[in-house]
Amino acid sequence: MRKTKTHNVLRRLLAFVLIVSLLPLGYAGNVMAATTGTRNVSIQVTYGQTDARNVYGMINSMRRNSSDAWYWDANNYTKTYCNNLQPLTYDYALEQVAMKRAAEIALSYSHTRPNGTNYYTAYSENGVYAGVYAENIGVNYSSASALHNAMREDNANYSGQEQRRNMLNSQFTAVGIGHVYYNGYHYWVEEFANTVTRTSYTTPNNQTTTVNNIQIAESNITSDQIVVPSSIGNYIQMSAGQTIDLSGCYENIKVSN
């Protein structure tokens, strides 16, 4: 079966190179080699899953409202109206995909994952197997309503309404949404699928969380530096049996966007 994929990016205030400040070197599993050409990193993000789940109701409200459920045709003259759309089911397995992807786009804002693979490879990693799927991503929207208003793309033409068409796609039956705050920016991900995997409720994660084992392709790393605090100094002399606390050191990786 041919699988559809959508590459939709809301770019806002992204004219910068993302800097990954990793956890202290004393933290187990901080940075390690993965497969050839990739590296595993761990980062701390603050999840906002209560806000993320608020977007879910907004999407279904849009699908139910006949005055909202439309998009421009390719000619930008006529509209397609999406009648009798069924509400999407909130899928907690898809939410796990979206949460992982939200952390990943904080490092590399793209539908391509930091390890160089397509976004949908994250589905099977979380037990989601869909024939039709799509992803919407957004950055620097501090609230659920601000994100959704941008994703609606009310004033865009056909080429600019990809996110809108994803939300109104009759093939989709499930959605999961992720939201993280990292280095001063809010990152949001909406994952859509034509299958429902898990509907059992889970408590929303609104905590600062360590996300482990994010793979980054070596080709995406533009610089790699060990930062040593001044209290340790640039030169260390040790005697046999002596120990030195290096927990203040960390690795600073610059990742191309």
Language-model features: locations:
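A well-ordered secondary-structure block
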Residues: K100-E104, R113-R198
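Bacterial N-terminal signal peptides that target proteins for export
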Residues: K3-L14
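Short, well-ordered surface patches within globular domains
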Residues: A34-N126, R164, S170-V175
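Sec-dependent signal peptide cleavage junction
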Residues: L23-G37
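Short, solvent-exposed loop/edge segments of extracellular or virion-exposed proteins
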Residues: P229-Q237
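Ser/Thr/Gly/Pro-rich low-complexity, disordered linker/stalk segments of secreted
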Residues: R198-S223, V227, I244
